[in-house]
């Protein structure tokens, strides 16, 4: 699972995913990419599931770049606990994805293979996505 080696704060404030992305809007590494059409918190399990779906379909051909990383911990209180008494324990790690963020990039495979691999990854993510090519973002 993806998680940071160390963080400055154990329980940060929630970061908003509303609005459009400021960076990571273009394809920088690969030939094809997966761009988000919504904003959301994407946790480390969803990112890993999408990566595995892509690499299994491509059968170790090509290269995959993950442009998002889960830096922020999300806390949650246990079930049936009364309100108050502080913030809950860190439950999972999330990446903040805004509208227009390129989340994954692929190179070294044909366009139809890349399109299908990224389609499989789309089903693992909680945001609407679209397939983009280099230079057509």
UniProtKB/Swiss-Prot annotation:
Cellular component GO terms held in the UniProt record: cytosolic large ribosomal subunit
Q: What does this protein do?
A: Binds 23S rRNA and is also seen to make contacts with the A and possibly P site tRNAs.
Task: Please report which protein family the annotation says this sequence is part of.
Answer: Belongs to the universal ribosomal protein uL16 family.
* GO biological processes: translation
**InterPro entries to which the protein is assigned, alphabetical:** Ribosomal_uL16, Ribosomal_uL16_bact-type, Ribosomal_uL16_CS, Ribosomal_uL16_dom, Ribosomal_uL16_sf
Keywords, A to Z, come to: Ribonucleoprotein, Ribosomal protein, RNA-binding, rRNA-binding, tRNA-binding
UniProt keyword tRNA-binding present: yes
Checking PANTHER family in the record gives: 50S/60S RIBOSOMAL PROTEIN L16, LARGE RIBOSOMAL SUBUNIT PROTEIN UL16M
Q: What is this protein called?
A: Large ribosomal subunit protein uL16
Q: Which Pfam families match?
A: Ribosomal_L16
Cite a single GO MF annotation. structural constituent of ribosome
Which SUPFAM superfamilies has this protein been placed in? Ribosomal protein L16p/L10e
Instruction: Tell me the Gene3D superfamilies matching this sequence.
Output: Ribosomal protein L10e/L16
Oligomeric form and interacting partners: Part of the 50S ribosomal subunit.
């Amino acid at each position: 699972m993806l998680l940071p080696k160390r963080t400055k704060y154990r329980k940060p404030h929630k970061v908003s995913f509303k609005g459009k992305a400021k960076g990571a809007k273009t394809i920088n590494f690969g030939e094809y990419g997966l761009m988000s059409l919504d904003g959301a918190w994407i946790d480390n399990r969803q990112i890993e599931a999408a990566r595995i779906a892509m690499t299994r379909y491509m059968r170790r051909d090509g290269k995959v770049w993950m442009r998002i990383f889960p830096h922020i911990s999300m806390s949650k209180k246990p079930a049936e606990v009364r309100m108050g008494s502080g913030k809950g324990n860190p439950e999972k790690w999330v990446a903040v994805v805004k509208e227009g963020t390129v989340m994954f990039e692929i190179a070294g495979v044909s366009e139809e293979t890349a399109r299908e691999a990224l389609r499989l990854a789309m089903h693992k993510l909680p945001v609407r996505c679209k397939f983009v090519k280099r230079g057509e973002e």
